[in-house]
């Protein structure tokens, strides 16, 4: 679904995230966590059409990860 992700511009609470495409491909594939803000944006963006993609983000994502990028708080 790399092509689908590239067609959309994503915005987090701190602004546009250029590496989001690579981040999505990496996290969804490896099953790592995705910051809540990015996950929510993806959820709202694909809510109407790509329900399958939503499940992937929700299952692999978490809301406990800060936007600072630091996994350990």
Curated annotation (Swiss-Prot):
Record keyword Zinc present = yes
- Name where it's found: Membrane
Sorted keywords for this record are: Aminopeptidase, Hydrolase, Membrane, Metalloprotease, Protease, Transmembrane, Zinc
Top-rank EC class of the record's enzyme: hydrolase
Q: In the Enzyme Commission scheme, what number(s) does this protein have?
A: 3.4.14.4
**Predominant localisation class:** membrane
Question: How is activity influenced by pH?
Answer: Optimum pH is 5.1.
One annotated GO molecular function is:
dipeptidyl-peptidase activity
Q: How and how many cofactors are bound, per the record note? A: Binds 1 zinc ion per subunit.
- Give an example GO biological process: proteolysis
User: Can you cite an annotated GO cellular component?
Assistant: membrane
Reactions catalysed, as given in the entry? Release of an N-terminal dipeptide from a peptide comprising four or more residues, with broad specificity. Also acts on dipeptidyl 2-naphthylamides
Cofactor(s) for this protein? Answer: Zn(2+)
Membrane topology designation: Multi-pass membrane protein
Family (UniProt): Belongs to the peptidase M49 family.
The UniProt function text for this chain reads:
Degrades neuropeptide proctolin (RYLPT) by cleavage between Tyr and Leu residues.
Q: Further notes on this entry? A: Purified protein is present in 2 isoforms; 76 kDa and 80 kDa.
Question: What is the designated name of this protein?
Answer: Dipeptidyl peptidase 3
């Amino acid at each position: 679904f790399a092509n689908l992700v590239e067609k959309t511009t994503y915005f987090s609470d701190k602004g546009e995230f250029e590496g989001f495409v690579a981040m999505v491909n990496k996290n969804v594939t490896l099953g790592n966590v995705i910051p809540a803000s990015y996950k929510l944006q993806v959820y709202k963006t694909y809510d109407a059409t790509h329900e399958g993609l939503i499940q992937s983000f929700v299952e692999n994502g978490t809301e406990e990860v800060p936007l600072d990028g630091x996994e350990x708080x």
